[in-house]
Amino acid sequence: MNPNAVWPRTAQSSLKKHQVSLCTCQRRSHYRLRSFSTFADRKIHQSAGFSSSSKNHDRLSHRAREKLLDREFFLSLLSSASTQREAKSYLARLKAQHQPDLPQKPTSAPASTAKIPPLPSGVNLGSFYGASRSVYETPVFRQGPTPTPRQDQPERLHLALVKLSIPQTLDDTIIDGVAKTLAQLDRLGLTCCVMIDPGAAEDARLLRTLATEQADRLAIAIHKQPDSKSLRLDSVLSVDPATPHLPKVLSRKALLKPLRDGHTVILTPIAYTEDVPRAVMVSADDAVLALTRELAGLATFPDPDEDPLTTAERIGRLQKEVSLDRVILLHPLGGIPAFNWRQSSHVFINMEQEYDDIENELLQARDVISAGDANLTASDILQHPSSVAVSNPLSKFVHKEIVPLPPARSLSPMVPEAQRSAVEGHLENLRLSQKALAMLPSASSGIITSPIEVANSAKTDQPSDLSVVGTRRQRNPLIHNLLTDKPLLSSSLPMSRRGPIISAQGILNPVTSHTTFVKRGMPLTILPNPWVKPWSAQRQPRLRLDDPSIDLPRLVHLIEDSFNRKLDVQDYLNRVNDRLAGLIIAGEYEGGAILTWELPPGVQDDGSAENSARMVPYLDKFAVLKRSQGAGGVADIVFNAMVRTCFPNGVCWRSRKNNPVNKWYFERSLGTWKLSDTNWTMFWTTPGLVEDSQKFRDYEAVCRSIQPSWAEDTGVVD
């Protein structure tokens, strides 16, 4: 058999693991569709729109095209990851997920030799008075319990639930860019289920037609991508007329089967009534929540007569079938605005901590617009600051660290109706993300971004005849998040550290992100509460680490696990209890910071205002559990709370000169100083510290004088 033979479509399709199927719209479209092989096997490949006069040249051109496609894919992959290590680690995880379990080798029990039982008298009389050996060696047939056949558990399906809002306002270039990104996510092991949101209209029939047309449009764009299959599903949702806001999935199997077959499934917010089958439009947000509920295994209602253990096992099996890893909202408005003219959108939202404050901020913006302000801008919102604008550790950047935007880039005024509509859209996206993530495991996350940003980052670089130095490819927010489970920009990174990008044409582009990364997150506990009373160096009853409100054993475990060293607890308590400024705890002691007020050597602690003014705000311990390091934004949450809520006027700390975390510290500090004759580097976030020689000497003296409280000597020179 010739290995280079070109197979016809029918024969080729039978050899592939995943067959290429056409969506409903494509059966009646005029597009000429291309059949693609799977990502793992591209030995056989054909294209309906590609021809050549020579078969050898045809095969060569196909190979060149395949190499170009692979190059484009991996360039997008590597450019979307912060480091090559992140891309490599994700590919290793992806490979491990798809490795089948090795079957266990059957083991045969050794044949046992027949033993002649002793007589009751206890005297061994040989075999003369006993039965013959053949009797003892005769096999005995016993009916044992029938083993339950093991049911092969299907491979867990990793899904992303995507809501694409008002795609009719997007041109074909944007739709193609979104389709390309969805196809790349599928190649990376994240299958996408897309819900089309056509917006609002008075005519329900017109809205249904519009939703169907846009679903077909996206399905065709996805199918044109290499190795991609798309399918528009109808009759997925049902609704009870008594509760039109609570649609539900008609058939779980009908929804999951095309997803398991590798299709990108496109859905519309059309449900069918249960009493009399009739197509009705439902809210796209309600449809997304219904899909989330079903895919999370929470849509089944337990039978009151069913054993609770049986119910739990049944729900557990459903949850093991599917892992809904991402909830992606593609909306022209982009990420949730921070209402700070020095930044465009929230980079990261910890829902457990921030949701109420950000919702109140958006509601307040809506009220200001409703009051009749026709020229409302983001700076106007800051004239009426909410609690999030003043104290939220993940929302407001330190004013002195941020370079103001030029007047030309200020937010342009909008008419009140458009402003109100925009704020309502942001509110809906925020609430939908919160409700969806509340039903999912803490490992799941959400992304709110604009289709334009996704499409622009998916553009193919055009070769240039000029020999110029170009810029790095724009990172795709969806692929970057899949690889790293982090936002494009660290939420604790000051804007002044996000330098401008110089393009090939010499144009300065500020590094901004219109993408918001959302996590269900973790609660943040700050003791004492700085919103009740700001932390002060004045003499007052101070918090102690052995206070009943603090779980000291868990705090000690956090420190020892993070530093990988044993703490001398009593010595540490004796040192910090009388000078403790406060404590920051993220989640269930997954991360934390211990902050103190330190007096420079030689300064008396007499409570005078002069000596109290010389107290140095000091970060004594900054710890994150090993299992939480580098993921979930725990370090960012704690650090932001420290520099933006607890010590907004500045704080200092020290770190060993060879500490690998120093690069992270350097990016977030305002200055560093290597302490001579020691193994320490001093960091600070205090503005103008270098100009104040007395304060600088106090900071340096404190960082030199503090003695460690470790229980054993590990050989590390402090």
From Swiss-Prot:
GO biological process, one term: ornithine biosynthetic process
Origin superkingdom: Eukaryota
Transit peptide: 1-36
Cellular compartment(s): Mitochondrion
Pathway(s) where this gene product acts: Amino-acid biosynthesis; L-arginine biosynthesis; N(2)-acetyl-L-ornithine from L-glutamate: step 1/4
Cellular component terms per the entry's GO annotation: mitochondrial matrix
PROSITE patterns assigned to the protein according to its UniProt record, in alphabetical order: GNAT_NAGS
EC number from the UniProt entry: 2.3.1.1
InterPro entries listed in its UniProt record: GlcNAc_Synth_fun (IPR011190), Vertebrate-like_GNAT_dom (IPR006855)
Major place of residence: mitochondrion
Annotated GO MF terms: L-glutamate N-acetyltransferase activity
Acyltransferase among keywords: yes
Keyword presence, Mitochondrion: yes
Keywords: Acyltransferase, Amino-acid biosynthesis, Mitochondrion, Transferase, Transit peptide
Reaction(s) the record says it catalyses: L-glutamate + acetyl-CoA = N-acetyl-L-glutamate + CoA + H(+)
Region (Disordered): 97-116
Domain N-acetyltransferase residue range list: 539-708
Pfam families reported in the protein's UniProt record: NAT
Function of the molecule: N-acetylglutamate synthase involved in arginine biosynthesis.
UniProt record similarity statement: Belongs to the acetyltransferase family.
PANTHER family in alphabetical order: AMINO-ACID ACETYLTRANSFERASE, MITOCHONDRIAL, N-ACETYLGLUTAMATE SYNTHASE
The protein, known as: Amino-acid acetyltransferase, mitochondrial
Protein source organism: Aspergillus clavatus (strain ATCC 1007 / CBS 513.65 / DSM 816 / NCTC 3887 / NRRL 1 / QM 1276 / 107)
